[in-house]
Amino acid sequence: QASMKEKKDFAVMSGIKPTGEFHLGTLMTAKEIIYFQKQGAQAFYAIADIEAYEDNRLSFEETEKIAVGNIADLLALGFDHKNGHIYRQYKEQRVRDMAVHFGAGVTLATMKAIYGERHIGLYLSALIQAGDILLPQHKDFGGPKPTVVPVGVDQDAHLRLTRDLANKFRKKFKFIPPSSTYHKILKGLDGSAKMSKRNPMSYFTLNEPPKAIGKKIACAFTGGRATVEEQKKLGGIPEICPIYEIEMCHFVEDDKEVCKTYNCCKCGSLLCGEHKAKTKQIVMKFVEEHQRKREKLVDTAREILGVD
């Protein structure tokens, strides 16, 4: 915040594991990166293809194809690639070099304590991610600077490890420990604790047909009561409603409008069918516009990633 106010150098860094299409979680991260980039941050976006290989056994050829789509999504959302650094872990030598250094700063016991009993490749992947997070402070990008890393709360372990490594290697590299923001893990559209690829009805991607997304929203769980009469009398429960949640976190920018929706649901004047219909139109319009932009940016994404 001080760097933004005082117009000093700072960076924002995050990325994506290229295992599938953009969904609301990756959308949240992308929007945060773009926000900080517009505030003057040097922006870095990693394609975590080494992690995808170690964790999901996806080949670099497979993740290359997925990454092109991911980057086209990022560009369509407003990322300025001319003033940012987009890269694949597999191709970024500076990240891999830092991981080699960091290997001397952790023990096997530490990695087991953080990540549990896993194969060595996943521990290596964690060190690669530390290299990603600290890449903005590499001398080639201007050296040490405050860095913010927007991630989901499930990535907290990586940030804690990286801050520890930044302190351990401060004398050698003069790192400033990175800060982080944690975005909300959204409930599944089916009412589950979070959206999951295991259940296609619990989430949607930005590349699904808009009508299919509309159908998922229409079929979604809500915080409504058993009957219309009961809802009008007792009010709905927006706190458990994924429709309210995706609207609040993604598709309605005006806080007053979000508060109005909450209060109308709570007092029973807004019924679930009406709310779903409104949200469905907002989401479908956003997705249609996004897909039009994305289609025009696929070739640019291929060029950025060096894909023929």
Model-derived features with residue positions:
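Glycine- and acidic
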Residues: M13-P18, P146-T147, T261-C265
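A generic short-segment signal for beta-strand/edge and adjacent turn/coil regions
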Residues: M13-I16, V151, F173, I213
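Positively charged, phosphate-engaging catalytic surfaces used for nucleic-acid and nucleotide handling
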Residues: N83-Y203, C241-I243
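Active-site oxyanion-binding pockets that recognize sulfate/phosphate
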Residues: R57, V148, G152, S269
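N-terminal Rossmann-like or analogous alpha/beta NTP/dinucleotide-binding catalytic cores
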Residues: Q1-A11, P18-H138, R292-E295
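A short glycine/serine-rich beta->alpha loop
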Residues: I16-F22, G116-R118, T147-V151, Q231-G235
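Compositionally biased, low-complexity linear motifs
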Residues: Y35-Q42, P144-P146, T205-N207
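Conserved nucleotide- and phosphate/pyrophosphate-binding catalytic cores
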Residues: G143, D156-A157, R163-D308
